[in-house]
């Protein structure tokens, strides 16, 4: 892409800052029976269809069917319109998956059957829907995406009128309504049946919003940026945002065909981005996932920089400038112990939550914090956006590089000294309560005592599949690998008991 420039706009506090809303429930720090030294709150309440980030599964296979989507559309419209004297307006955005058309039409049908108005945004990033829900004063926003999953999966996640993801309690109410249609009352008839319309400039509105989060006194002129949009929702918006701020942009993953989203590209597969950064001698590489709510960055040396490192470097600068609220960073139980120690050295602290960016956001809102995220790359700059936004996070990293006049590799090395961390995924036939897995529980207690204050053990179920995740941290990687193998073997024994 040719280098372009545009007039820099002064950030608009009204459009860049989400509307204030009532605080969400307190954050959850241990998930699905997780065993974690840093656990600070009970696990999220189990629901039938909703997981850690909405409903997700293989498209056209239960639960991710058009039949369920139709029922969900009806339930959302009922809740969004409750107590209002107007037909609820509900936005629908999606990523580039082939199955998105099917799910979109089913949701729209359910909404219209309840008298709701549907605004179709087309393929846009998840954070674009969150922003548009507030800027257009909609009653809800729906995103059809399975994020980083392969193309044959899909999912549905929901934002309230305030631009924030729904809490567990609201999702539980939707499930109850979906399972008992009598609770929804009569369907709309005649002229009260809803209608659907397209929002033609949804991408343009988001591009303007994203650019407003970049400091008006800085310019990306002369900065070389490689963007990998994963053939996903940001395939048009992300390159445009950086180019219009002056960067020389090279674009990867911008030719979606319905089945190539996340395929060997994007945040999960940064190898191609690394090669292109080195080839172009770029200053930074930015890899997004399918719905562009997270990013992984690559420095000028071709080294991958994850969410923990980005949070550490941004927190350090914000503390120095007096901008980090209460000198506190919010992250999940999966973030490296080194991040905790880095915050302590800065005179700050780290608050941990359950896995899932919405639990991070809930903790930020209830605690009055403004920076948080996940190791996986969901980064929330609450002064700018109400949810994780890979494009905006990339802009904040670029602003940090320009402010400090330091290369990304230097910033990352200075900010975070990692503790060795091992992640082991164990596929099992079905989920069982962790407390019922006696061999695993007994060994977990021994391992926790062995690690002491020098390490951590976290054992939790995946939020979307029967996969046990074991995370170990400590000073000796070889010891961690041996312990991880022993724990995995214990879990397999329990699974067959």
For each feature predicted by the language model, list its residue ranges:
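Gly/Ser/Thr-enriched, mixed-charge loops and adjacent short helices
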Residues: 37-45, 58, 154-280
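Phosphate-binding and adjacent anionic-ligand microenvironments
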Residues: 282-284, 321-497
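Short glycine-rich phosphate-binding loop at a beta-alpha junction
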Residues: 85-95, 119, 224-226, 328-333, ...
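Short glycine-centered, acidic/aromatic-flanked micro-motifs in structured strand/loop junctions
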Residues: 93-95, 227-229, 299, 383, ...
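An N-terminal, well-structured beta->alpha segment
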Residues: 2-13, 18-109, 113-114, 139, ...
């Amino acid at each position: 892409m040719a280098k372009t420039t545009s007039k820099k706009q002064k950030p608009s506090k009204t459009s860049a800052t989400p509307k204030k809303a009532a605080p969400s429930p307190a954050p959850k720090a241990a998930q699905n029976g997780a065993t974690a030294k840093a656990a600070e709150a009970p696990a999220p309440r189990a629901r039938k269809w909703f997981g850690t980030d909405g409903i997700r599964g293989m498209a056209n296979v239960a639960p991710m069917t058009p039949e369920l989507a139709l029922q969900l559309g009806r339930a959302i419209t009922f809740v969004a319109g409750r107590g209002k004297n107007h037909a609820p307006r509900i936005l629908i955005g999606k990523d580039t998956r082939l199955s998105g058309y099917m799910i979109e039409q089913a949701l729209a049908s359910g909404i219209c059957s309840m008298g709701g108005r549907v605004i179709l945004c087309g393929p846009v990033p998840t954070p674009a829907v969150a922003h548009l829900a507030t800027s257009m004063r909609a009653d809800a926003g729906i995103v059809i995406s399975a994020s980083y999953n392969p193309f044959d999966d899909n999912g549905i996640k929901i934002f309230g009128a305030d631009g924030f993801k729904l809490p567990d309690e609201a999702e539980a109410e939707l499930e109850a309504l979906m399972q008992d249609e009598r609770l929804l009352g009569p369907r709309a008839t005649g002229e009260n049946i809803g209608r659907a319309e397209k929002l033609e400039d949804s991408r343009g509105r988001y591009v303007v919003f994203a650019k407003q989060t970049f400091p008006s006194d800085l310019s990306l002129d002369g900065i070389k940026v490689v963007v990998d949009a994963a053939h996903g929702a940001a395939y048009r918006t992300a390159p445009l945002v950086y180019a219009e701020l002056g960067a020389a942009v090279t674009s990867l993953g911008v030719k979606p065909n319905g089945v190539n989203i996340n395929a060997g590209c994007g945040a999960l597969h940064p190898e191609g981005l690394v090669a292109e950064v080195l080839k172009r001698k770029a200053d930074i590489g930015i890899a997004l996932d399918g719905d562009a709510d997270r990013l992984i960055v690559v420095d000028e040396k071709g080294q991958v920089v994850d969410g923990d490192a980005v949070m550490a470097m941004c927190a350090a600068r914000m503390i120095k400038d007096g901008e980090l609220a209460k000198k506190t960073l919010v992250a999940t139980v999966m973030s490296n112990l080194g991040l905790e120690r880095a915050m302590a050295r800065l005179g700050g602290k780290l608050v941990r939550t359950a896995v899932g960016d919405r639990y991070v956001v809930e903790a930020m809102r209830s605690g009055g914090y403004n920076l948080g995220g996940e190791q996986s790359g969901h980064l929330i700059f609450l002064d700018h956006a109400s949810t994780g936004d890979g494009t905006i996070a990339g802009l904040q990293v670029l602003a940090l590089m320009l402010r400090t006049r330091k290369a990304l590799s230097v910033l990352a090395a200075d900010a975070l000294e990692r503790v060795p961390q091992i992640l082991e995924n164990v596929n099992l036939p079905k989920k069982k309560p962790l407390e019922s897995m006696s061999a695993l529980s007994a060994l977990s207690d021994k391992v926790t005592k062995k690690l002491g204050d020098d390490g951590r053990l976290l054992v939790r179920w995946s939020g979307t599949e029967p996969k046990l995740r074991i995370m170990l941290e400590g000073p000796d990687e070889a010891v961690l690998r041996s312990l991880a193998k022993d724990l995995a073997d214990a879990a397999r024994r329990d699974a067959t008991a």
